[in-house]
Amino acid sequence: KLIPEKYNRGTDPTDYYKINHTVAMGILARTALYARDWQTAYDYASKVLEKNPYLMTEAEYKSGFNNCNNGEWLWGYSATQDDSDGAYTMNFKDKSLDGYGSLCVDPYFVENYHDNDYRKDLFQDWGYTAQGGKVVRLLNSKFAFQDIDNGITDMDLMRTSEMYLIKAEAAYYLHNTDEAKSVLYTLQQARMKEGKTAPEITATGEDLLKAIWLERRLELWGEGFAITDIIRNQQSIERKEFEGPVIIKEEDEEGNITTEEATGTGHDVLKFNDGTDFCPNSKYYLYRIPLNEELQNQNLYKNHEKLDFYR
């Protein structure tokens, strides 16, 4: 109510960090999803999509996720050369600069994309990562610098696709199965290559819910939702060891492509820090309060005693 519906934040990319009425409703939809308030999540996601139902084209999706002017972006941050980059983590998402590109994808995860899904094309290049130039992993082509010479780009904070997924999940819990399928299918069809049709959604019951959760992983990969979804849905991290022969392709400044055989690897960490297997509801999924903060803030546990779970 404090943000007028007609409030205009501006159209310049540097204005997209401001929260307008649509973004506020998106935040409410996201918050309600996390709180398992399904009707509120459904209502606000629906209102956002009434204002902006747009979903990216294939060309836009493959352009690097680096432009706040993208019609699907509801909220974003546009970095400039004048900004401080002390915590500018986008540097580690772009594979094109030597010493960076450490945000890699699980080779097994890519198998979840349909062959006609153009998102799958973004996870096909094996190459050397930031870790000393010796480790070969499956790199991501989803994120790219807008200005590679200066290492800056725009970063998305909220997209309409998230609203489709919130609406689909909320509809499922509200027992609107047909609508949940319809909303989910709308997003899946939008991610098919030109002339291709998304497979019919035949899943029912818990299988339909799992299909919605999987689509969140496929659509929002690398955008910061995975750990929250694992916690709220009481799921477990799933990782398998991967090591096998792969082909690395490199292109020089003249466009000549050379290939090299190498041994590709997947995750290094396959268990928790204490050596136990991954499981739901682990304390390792939670962000911890730094020890110095606990020592210096005498009132930290004044009203709520520190649980043994966190010791």
Task: Provide a role label for each language-model segment.
Residues K1-T89, Y113-R311:
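Acidic/polar-rich alpha-helix caps and helix-coil junctions
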Residues K95-V110, R119:
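Short, cationic low-complexity segments
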